[in-house]
């Protein structure tokens, strides 16, 4: 059990640092009121989860510890629902209701599509 906790912690730390680095890169190209950083990070995380799940289900390619490290740890630290929720609140407060609805819908639809795409890509491995 302690090993699994350690794997989640290390994976989560790496994911969090990488999320911060990605956000620094994206902030430089920010072009609208659309919260692009969280969207990109969550989309990448969903895509990666899809790949991991696909590999896991296909011939048990991934060991349980590898899944815990990457899916629960890394992807859990890399993606962020709290930032997504805060940005929704900020859009609401600013009166950007159309952007708010669009942001919520695009995140949910694109996130599910990214998981599916990642999963489908594992069919070629």
Swiss-Prot record:
InterPro entries linked to this entry: FluC
Primary location: membrane
Domain of life: Bacteria
Pfam families to which the protein is assigned, alphabetical: CRCB (PF02537)
GO cellular component terms attached to this protein's record: plasma membrane
Bilayer topology annotation: Multi-pass membrane protein
Keyword Cell membrane listed: yes
GO molecular function per UniProt: fluoride channel activity; metal ion binding
Documented activity regulation: Na(+) is not transported, but it plays an essential structural role and its presence is essential for fluoride channel function.
GO BP annotations listed: cellular detoxification of fluoride
Catalytic activity: fluoride(in) = fluoride(out)
Spans traversing the lipid bilayer: 5-25, 33-53, 66-86, 100-120
Keyword set, alphabetical order: Cell inner membrane, Cell membrane, Ion channel, Ion transport, Membrane, Metal-binding, Sodium, Transmembrane, Transmembrane helix, Transport
Positions of Na(+) binding: 76, 79
Localization (cell): Cell inner membrane
Annotated family: Belongs to the fluoride channel Fluc/FEX (TC 1.A.43) family.
Record's function text: Fluoride-specific ion channel. Important for reducing fluoride concentration in the cell, thus reducing its toxicity.
HAMAP family, A to Z: FluC
Full protein name: Fluoride-specific ion channel FluC
């Amino acid at each position: 059990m302690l090993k699994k906790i350690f794997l989640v912690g290390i994976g989560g730390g790496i994911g969090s640092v990488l999320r911060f680095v990605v956000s620094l890169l994206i902030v430089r190209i920010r072009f609208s009121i659309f919260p692009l950083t969280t969207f990109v990070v969550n989309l990448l995380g969903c895509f990666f989860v899809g790949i991991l799940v696909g590999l896991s289900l296909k011939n048990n390619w991934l060991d349980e510890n590898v899944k815990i490290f990457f899916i629960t740890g890394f992807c859990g630290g890399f993606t962020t629902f709290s930032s997504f929720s805060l940005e929704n609140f900020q859009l609401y407060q600013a009166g950007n209701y159309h952007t708010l609805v669009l942001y919520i819908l695009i995140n949910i639809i694109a996130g599910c599509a990214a998981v599916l795409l990642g999963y489908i890509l594992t069919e070629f491995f």
